[in-house]
Amino acid sequence: MESNADWGSRGGLPQAFLTPGISSFSEFLKGFAPEYLPSGRPLPGGLGSASAAGDIAPHGTTIVSIAFPGGVLLAGDRRATMGNFIAQRDIEKVFPADEFSAVGIAGSAGLAVEVVRLFQLELEHYEKIEGVTLSTDGKANRLATMIRGNLAMAMQGLAVVPLFAGYDEETGQGRIFSYDVTGGMYEEHDFYSVGSGSMFARGALKKLFRPDFTAEDAAVAAVQALYDAADDDSATGGPDLFRKIFPVVAVVTEDGYRRLPDEELSTLVESIMDARRVVPDGPRSPLR
């Protein structure tokens, strides 16, 4: 294998770039320049413990996903924390993976964003090499492999925990996949949430979810769930009307990925806030 210096000094591309190979970009990078992978750079010594490593890097917190007939929604709050310190108020944690899928991130924010960028490139590379897009299951499995590759850093406190959602062109349905830090992949049904406020968000969605949701209904339920999570979890940020910071909300349907604009979210959030001035704990489901 030629080094970067060898081919850079000649001003040409190395043989690895000119030889047909596998359709996985991350596997190609592992063989050619593993130091550029998120998991390819060792942590410095002296951190002391996994919790200490986790406290030096901003952490993204709560992500929710809701399936509805003909699509799926993915939403995330905007707060990142370092221990008990608010590191950022307007971080974005929901990204398009490709035209028909999206990924939300919880865990170590910097590493997670890097994994998302590599995942986006992975899907684009596969499509260019193979001439077709990966299936929804194929995309979910590729992401699982990438998360598994980050296990060593996760064991040192820098975990990446994504939530993957996509529109399945074969079935015409929205699908949701969750992961653990070992790369274990699990398909979820109807709705799911990850991150520090996930237990509160999921509890809210249990009462709010309806199988006949429209995309607009799902957006309302997602913002309500994130509001409940922020109410009980200090690491989750609620909507900030003064700074005009709203959750990132995206829907994926047969028309592709669409992020809801802030103007649309502003109206939705204000209506929810108005209702909560009357009922602070949010909408209540009937007992029977």
Curated annotation (Swiss-Prot):
One of its GO terms (molecular function) is threonine-type endopeptidase activity. It catalyses: Cleavage of peptide bonds with very broad specificity. The active site is at T61. Residues 1-60 form a propeptide. Belongs to the peptidase T1B family. Its EC number is 3.4.25.1. Gene3D superfamilies: Glutamine Phosphoribosylpyrophosphate, subunit 1, domain 1. One of its GO terms (cellular component) is cytoplasm. Its main location: cytoplasm. InterPro entries: Ntn_hydrolases_N, Pept_T1A_subB, Proteasome_sua/b, Proteasome_suB-type, PSB_actinobac. Pathway: Protein degradation; proteasomal Pup-dependent pathway. Component of the proteasome core, a large protease complex with broad specificity involved in protein degradation. It comes from Catenulispora acidiphila (strain DSM 44928 / JCM 14897 / NBRC 102108 / NRRL B-24433 / ID139908). This is Proteasome subunit beta. Keywords: Autocatalytic cleavage, Cytoplasm, Hydrolase, Protease, Proteasome, Threonine protease, Zymogen. The formation of the proteasomal ATPase ARC-20S proteasome complex, likely via the docking of the C-termini of ARC into the intersubunit pockets in the alpha-rings, may trigger opening of the gate for substrate entry. Interconversion between the open-gate and close-gate conformations leads to a dynamic regulation of the 20S proteasome proteolysis activity. It holds the Pfam family Proteasome. It is found in: Cytoplasm. GO terms for biological process: modification-dependent protein catabolic process; proteasomal protein catabolic process. The 20S proteasome core is composed of 14 alpha and 14 beta subunits that assemble into four stacked heptameric rings, resulting in a barrel-shaped structure. The two inner rings, each composed of seven catalytic beta subunits, are sandwiched by two outer rings, each composed of seven alpha subunits. The catalytic chamber with the active sites is on the inside of the barrel. Has a gated structure, the ends of the cylinder being occluded by the N-termini of the alpha-subunits. Is capped by the proteasome-associated ATPase, ARC.
